[in-house]
């Protein structure tokens, strides 16, 4: 139900023309002075529990009337507040019940404008800060109108030895940047993050002006990095025992469970109308996977069930001013795994395993991660030794946040973050223990004749693909010679012939290396060798080989290795072709491979930006 409450000098209405849904015997003309006018729309989802919605609405109206010291109340049906209305019968029943219950208190004079009539009205709003209020009433939990719990937050740092420390002892370095942000003492930093310029100058990603803000166009060099990262997560999840699925990007808000889950995210959604159905674009893959789990026949001996989807795309309607580069988008790619566990003991075990995946992703991306563990006080008191064990296994200090009560679907979670070039966290991998969604979506199994709604783990082993690339680019700010891990480099080897007579040899070598699954291109442009070498450096190519007479005669290649180089001091090694192949394969061992996404001859390569 949607309410718009207006503190009015006066409200006057007059019924003009009835519709097919019109109430019989209306009061055709009426009004009130010094009143609280309650414009009301009853929604389709309210029909799940009309009594509960009415009770919540009455409580909200009474609360506002008390704040404003108002005794006159006028209930005004106003369909324009919602695009997903209930049946007329349900609406009349709800409006009549609200009117009746308010009258029964004996504290108010209550009137109700007729339902199903076109009406003209005049209203004067008082214009003070509380004179215009809007409320959304959610059936069932009543989350929209319940008083918010007073939740306190306690922070401390736990070291791998299990000792507890004050946060003030850990305010330096990357971990210190996370601590300062979480406890609210980080100093504001101006300017764009470093990656915003890099993503364009390296021809990875660009803004798409013809789309909504926060939607990007992926260029070939960026597309291959994105696809390799997606391959990486898929391989990781498959090795872990996950089962890939694919689910829709849009969902019907008429489904109560979906409506309630979506409503927790407030206005950060893309909502639209499809015929008579009120729809939304997903902001995570939860909806589809929970729907699959709800329809499954689950036996205790099949648990845990680990379900995975690369959510391409998920959508969040972030504030325009908050959208920036690859860090905060309105459309993004999220590797999303949900694990249905037997019980809490099973959930804790899966949590440990999935946290290891998160730490491993940082190692494989050559990006240092720092962590914060969050949980309710009740959880911490019960599982303190377990918390100490996961910090010990992580081998680094972790910030601990203790919430006095549960305010989300999770009772415990860990967030791992990279730190950008300006000292700001980029939250990436996460694991969460969800104790709410299996009940909401009716995901269950039976044990000893009892229905069990088990805990569900939410896990993104890497965080969004876009934020991974953001972290990789930001990481270069701390490198003396900026580079991506070799397995992610759009071009892994670049061949630079000195003269035209060397091009044929270089071309044959290029073919051989590409067949060996090494992304290799050939700079056959009519430019100086010096310029070609400089541009290979600007492209962050890990291995650069200049080919002249000596290379053709001896077969020995002078390879500049970027990872071992220093500014103005290139590291060079003499290698034959097989040694080169072994070197590159060793540096990319165990990582996914894709062939070149750009033309291998640079003379034919277009510029994208």
Curated annotation (Swiss-Prot):
GO annotation terms (biological process): threonyl-tRNA aminoacylation
Family annotation (Pfam families): HGTP_anticodon (PF03129), tRNA-synt_2b (PF00587), tRNA-Thr_ED (PF08915)
Superkingdom of origin organism: Archaea
Chain intervals for the UniProt region annotation (Catalytic): 194-485
CDD domains referenced in this protein's UniProt entry, alphabetically: ThrRS_anticodon
Protein name: Threonine--tRNA ligase
Keywords: Aminoacyl-tRNA synthetase, ATP-binding, Cytoplasm, Ligase, Metal-binding, Nucleotide-binding, Protein biosynthesis, RNA-binding, tRNA-binding, Zinc
GO molecular function terms attached to this record: ATP binding; threonine-tRNA ligase activity; tRNA binding; zinc ion binding
Cellular component terms (Gene Ontology): cytoplasm
Organism, as annotated: Methanosphaerula palustris (strain ATCC BAA-1556 / DSM 19958 / E1-9c)
Source organism phylogeny: Archaea, Methanobacteriati, Methanobacteriota, Stenosarchaea group, Methanomicrobia
Stated role: Catalyzes the attachment of threonine to tRNA(Thr) in a two-step reaction: L-threonine is first activated by ATP to form Thr-AMP and then transferred to the acceptor end of tRNA(Thr). Also edits incorrectly charged L-seryl-tRNA(Thr).
């Amino acid at each position: 139900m949607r309410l718009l409450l207006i503190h009015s000098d006066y409200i006057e209405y007059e019924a003009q023309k009835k519709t097919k849904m019109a109430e019989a015997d209306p009061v055709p003309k009426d009004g009130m002075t010094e009143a609280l006018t309650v414009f009301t729309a009853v929604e389709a989802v309210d029909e799940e529990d009309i009594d509960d919605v009415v009770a919540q609405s009455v409580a909200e109206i009474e609360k506002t009337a008390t704040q404003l010291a108002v005794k006159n109340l006028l209930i005004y049906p106003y369909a324009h507040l919602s695009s997903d209305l209930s049946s007329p019968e349900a609406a009349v029943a709800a409006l009549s019940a609200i009117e009746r219950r308010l009258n029964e208190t004996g504290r108010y004079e209550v009137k109700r404008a007729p339902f199903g009539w076109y009406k003209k009205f005049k209203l004067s709003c008082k214009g003070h800060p509380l004179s215009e209020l809007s409320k959304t009433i959610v059936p069932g939990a009543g989350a929209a109108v319940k008083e918010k719990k007073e939740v306190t937050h306690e922070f401390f740092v736990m070291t791998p030895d299990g000792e507890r420390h004050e946060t003030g002892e850990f305010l330096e370095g990357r971990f210190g940047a996370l601590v300062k942000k979480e406890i609210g003492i980080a100093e504001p930093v101006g300017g764009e993050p470093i990656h915003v310029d890099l993503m364009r100058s390296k021809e990875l990603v660009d803004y798409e002006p013809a789309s909504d803000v926060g939607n990007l166009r992926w260029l070939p060099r960026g597309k291959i990095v994105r696809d390799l990262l997606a391959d990486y997560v898929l391989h990781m999840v498959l090795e872990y025992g996950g089962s890939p699925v694919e689910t829709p990007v849009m969902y019907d808000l008429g489904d109560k469970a979906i409506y309630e889950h979506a409503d927790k995210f407030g206005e950060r959604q893309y909502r639209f109308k499809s015929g008579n159905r009120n729809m939304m674009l997903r902001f995570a893959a939860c909806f589809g996977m929970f729907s699959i789990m709800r329809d499954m026949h689950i036996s205790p001996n099949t648990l845990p069930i680990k379900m995975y989807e690369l959510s391409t795309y998920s959508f969040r309607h972030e504030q325009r001013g908050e959208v920036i580069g690859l860090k905060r988008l309105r459309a993004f790619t999220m590797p999303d795994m949900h694990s249905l566990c037997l019980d809490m003991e099973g959930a804790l075990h899966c949590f440990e395993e999935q946290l290891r995946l998160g730490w491993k992703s940082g190692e494989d991306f050559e990006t240092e991660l720092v962590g914060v563990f969050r949980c309710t006080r009740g959880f911490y008191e019960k599982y303190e030794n377990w918390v100490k064990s996961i910090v010990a296994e992580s081998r680094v200090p972790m910030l601990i946040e203790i919430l006095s009560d549960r305010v989300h679907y999770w009772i415990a979670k860990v967030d791992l973050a990279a730190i950008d070039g300006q000292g700001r966290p980029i939250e990436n991998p996460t694991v969460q223990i969800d104790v709410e969604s299996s009940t909401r979506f009716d995901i269950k199994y039976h044990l000893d004749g009892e229905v069990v709604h088990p805990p569900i783990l939410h896990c993104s082993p890497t965080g969004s693909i876009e934020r991974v690339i953001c972290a990789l680019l930001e990481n270069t700010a701390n490198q003396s010679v900026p580079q991506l891990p070799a397995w992610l480099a759009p071009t892994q080897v670049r061949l630079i012939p000195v003269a035209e007579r060397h091009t044929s040899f270089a071309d044959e070598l290029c073919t051989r290396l590409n067949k060996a699954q090494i992304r290799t291109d050939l700079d056959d442009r009519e430019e100086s060798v010096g310029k070609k070498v400089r541009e290979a450096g600007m492209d962050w190519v890990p291995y650069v080989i200049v080919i002249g007479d000596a290379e053709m005669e001896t077969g020995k290649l002078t390879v500049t290795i970027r990872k071992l180089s220093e500014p103005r001091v290139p590291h060079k090694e003499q290698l034959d072709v097989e040694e080169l192949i072994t070197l590159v394969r060793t540096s990319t061992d165990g990582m996914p491979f894709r062939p070149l996404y750009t033309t291998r001859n640079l003379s034919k390569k277009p510029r994208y930006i």
